[in-house]
């Protein structure tokens, strides 16, 4: 049976990811010896 969307009075807002600067994006970079 087809899935039904939840009926809500208010429109559903999609959560937007906070803007991440490209420079800061490399967080878990490992040092190679």
Curated annotation (Swiss-Prot):
Compartments, as annotated in UniProt: Nucleus; Chromosome
Keyword DNA-binding part of the UniProt annotation: yes
GO biological process: cell differentiation; chromosome condensation; spermatogenesis
Region (Disordered): 1-33
Keywords for the protein's UniProt record, in alphabetical order: Chromosome, Developmental protein, Differentiation, DNA condensation, DNA-binding, Nucleosome core, Nucleus, Spermatogenesis
GO CC list: nucleosome; nucleus
GO molecular function annotations of the record: DNA binding
Tissue note: Testis.
UniProt key word Ion transport: no
Function comment: Protamines substitute for histones in the chromatin of sperm during the haploid phase of spermatogenesis. They compact sperm DNA into a highly condensed, stable and inactive complex.
Protein name: Protamine TP17
Species this chain originates from: Oncorhynchus mykiss
């Amino acid at each position: 049976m087809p899935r039904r969307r939840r009926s809500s009075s208010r429109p559903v807002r999609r959560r937007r990811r906070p803007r991440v600067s490209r420079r800061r994006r490399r967080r878990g970079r490992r040092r190679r010896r």
